[in-house]
């Protein structure tokens, strides 16, 4: 098999996005557009990927580090000029080169593989990826002769009335013989209204040299959708989300209403898990088998075990074991580690907290910078007081501890195994194993005094 190379065009500023963020870095389902493109290319056994960068070059290189080499296009003088910037990396090499736009996040590896195969079968010097759409306005048209052989690409503004009725368009993705590409690029002129160097002119140069130019027509236009503004970004995200959600459903996940379920591309979900409408699963979240995630839940970069029930809760950068009940309205903040068979009830918040197996935090509890053992019961309104206004400190609770309602544990503090904290206590000192910790004022009943307070009518 001949060598394979790829050039990704990612130097355009993207002024129509009206954004401080560089265009190809706008995310589509949790990943920058250009990273979608490069990740698909990386599955094709490509020997070298060269990304042409311009505006925001450093940020693009950060996202694609280890996945691509980079060449900077200091002046944006057209697509042919952009590809020519890869001359030092690729010119003179035997093989084929894919040219793909970095703002086409829906392009799939299978389509590019089919393009490469077709290019090889036709023994072409260039093969254009084309598609057919109902309204081709604004796109370059593919002009073929009576035998179906590609003659040229005509831009919409230059097309005759007859040519404008052609519905086969240029998607902007190409496969070239590498040597022929760079030889032709040297002859591309900027003799046009915009004064730029255009890649479709390479097709004309090759045709004028009697080289074979082919066109591979793909079925779906959506893969070629270029994102140039926020409307197209929303459309690309919608199409990508549909693709992601359908893939999960094919693999045994129930999405009750896929149209209202947001799932990032790197999320993994086990079989027989049910995701209700209005759920957001972001980042590199992993969810095990037989889970239920109800409406209004958001899970970000977290690992969820099997048979977990998340009810209208938020989980961020945390780990949850098997057979755990969470919510409703619980908030697991980063670095929470919830072990098996734990109950995290309504209005419970954890942060940098380890919660041991079988422990119950039923309702209205805050546990921050805490290490909680096995089979602990923490009563309603209890708080691990971890911040003194300047520094954070840790609370350690042993196994089989009972913490009564409305208890404050003033960190740093340690409660030993099997200890009992009386309700309403403010614990400022360590409580030994098997001890009762009680720290509250003694109750004093003033007999008959209430009638002087005028609190009743």
Curated annotation (Swiss-Prot):
Active-site residues, as the UniProt record annotates them: 363 (proton acceptor)
Keywords: Acyltransferase, Cell shape, Cell wall biogenesis/degradation, Cytoplasm, Magnesium, Metal-binding, Multifunctional enzyme, Nucleotidyltransferase, Peptidoglycan synthesis, Repeat, Transferase
GO cellular component annotations of the record: cytoplasm; membrane
List of residues binding Mg(2+): 103, 228
Cofactor: Mg(2+)
Record note on cofactor: Binds 1 Mg(2+) ion per subunit.
Pathway noted in the entry: Nucleotide-sugar biosynthesis; UDP-N-acetyl-alpha-D-glucosamine biosynthesis; N-acetyl-alpha-D-glucosamine 1-phosphate from alpha-D-glucosamine 6-phosphate (route II): step 2/2; Nucleotide-sugar biosynthesis; UDP-N-acetyl-alpha-D-glucosamine biosynthesis; UDP-N-acetyl-alpha-D-glucosamine from N-acetyl-alpha-D-glucosamine 1-phosphate: step 1/1; Bacterial outer membrane biogenesis; LPS lipid A biosynthesis
Domain of life from the UniProt record: Bacteria
Location of the region described as N-acetyltransferase in the Swiss-Prot/TrEMBL record: 252-457
Coiled-coil positions: none
Region (Pyrophosphorylase): 1-230
One GO MF term: UDP-N-acetylglucosamine diphosphorylase activity
Binding site for UDP-N-acetyl-alpha-D-glucosamine: 9-12, 23, 73, 78-79, 140, 155, 170, 228, 333, 351, 366, 377
Gene3D superfamilies for this protein: Hexapeptide repeat proteins, Spore Coat Polysaccharide Biosynthesis Protein SpsA, Chain A
Catalyses which reaction(s): alpha-D-glucosamine 1-phosphate + acetyl-CoA = N-acetyl-alpha-D-glucosamine 1-phosphate + CoA + H(+); N-acetyl-alpha-D-glucosamine 1-phosphate + UTP + H(+) = UDP-N-acetyl-alpha-D-glucosamine + diphosphate
Binding site for acetyl-CoA: 386-387, 423, 440
CDD domains recorded: GT2_GlmU_N_bac, LbH_GlmU_C
Role, per record: Catalyzes the last two sequential reactions in the de novo biosynthetic pathway for UDP-N-acetylglucosamine (UDP-GlcNAc). The C-terminal domain catalyzes the transfer of acetyl group from acetyl coenzyme A to glucosamine-1-phosphate (GlcN-1-P) to produce N-acetylglucosamine-1-phosphate (GlcNAc-1-P), which is converted into UDP-GlcNAc by the transfer of uridine 5-monophosphate (from uridine 5-triphosphate), a reaction catalyzed by the N-terminal domain.
Binding partners and assembly: Homotrimer.
Family: In the N-terminal section; belongs to the N-acetylglucosamine-1-phosphate uridyltransferase family.
Protein name: Bifunctional protein GlmU
Organism, scientific name: Listeria monocytogenes serovar 1/2a (strain ATCC BAA-679 / EGD-e)
Gene: glmU
